[in-house]
Amino acid sequence: MGEVRRVSIDTPIEELLSILDEDAGLVIEDVLNSESLDLIKNDLEPFLNVTKNGQDAFTGYETKRVGALMARSKTCQDLALHPLINEMAGIFLGPHCENYQLHFSSAIQIGSGESSQILHRDRGVWGGYIPRKIETQFSTVWAITDFTEENGATQVVPGSHKWDKNRQPLPEEVAYAEMKSGSVFIYTGSVLHGGGTNNTEQQRLGVFLHYAPNWLRQQENQYLSYPPEIAKEFSPELRSLIGYSKGGYVLGFYTDPTDMEGKLESVSPEKIFGDSQDRYSTLATPENLVQGSSKK
């Protein structure tokens, strides 16, 4: 059987990124304390109680999914902004973007009797149009309960991010991201993975927070999940992370359709909240635009 490497929170970031480059997945153990775990469980319980199971084999007939986590759990906001995770995401995605954004948030609860999910690569959400050499996703799964092979721990095929797209793994190449509650599994958008089979009476609960380059469309529509009247309650850092910021000098501006005085014409999204604006808030020079047209 394949193996997912497990490391401690004080492991040097260079080593973490080296493992991610080699295997496309690793577990950092004991990141969250019991208080944080209890807060997340309490925040999510009302939504999980009323959410219906999936309606197909991929989403899982015994699996519940709850999104819009930034609006539903303050502690999940803290996870999204976790300093180590964001530092790793910035370095990992950095070769292919100026900055990154929150791409997806979901609490996924695999119930008793659930069957395993088909192995897949998350980068497929963009339809296969992006060259494989561009890594599009830095993903995290926070274990709110223990993850075991028996209760549906994520299946993953270490090293499969370097395979031909049509190669299928042998049974002995599949590993399980087993971890204690409070740990986090980090993986890439190019590695084969999928939810596991739950042969227990337990519920396996994880918080999935994924990051992507800020020039790509997000899987979870952040602006409908968190419209301005909700996003105004977030910190400026979280607003920027979910996309209320520009991704380049002329990427991501907005215009107020009700503005009859021309005050909010093609401005940076931060302006709507009165936040400090970033380096893209100034007018681009012709040199900026020309240099930004190609990295070669």
Task: Tell where the protein language model's regions lie, with residue ranges.
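A structural signal for short, well-ordered beta-strand segments
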Residues: 104-107, 140-142, 207-211
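Short Ser/Thr-interspersed hydrophobic loop/turn segments at strand-loop and sheet-helix junctions
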Residues: 108, 146-147, 190-191
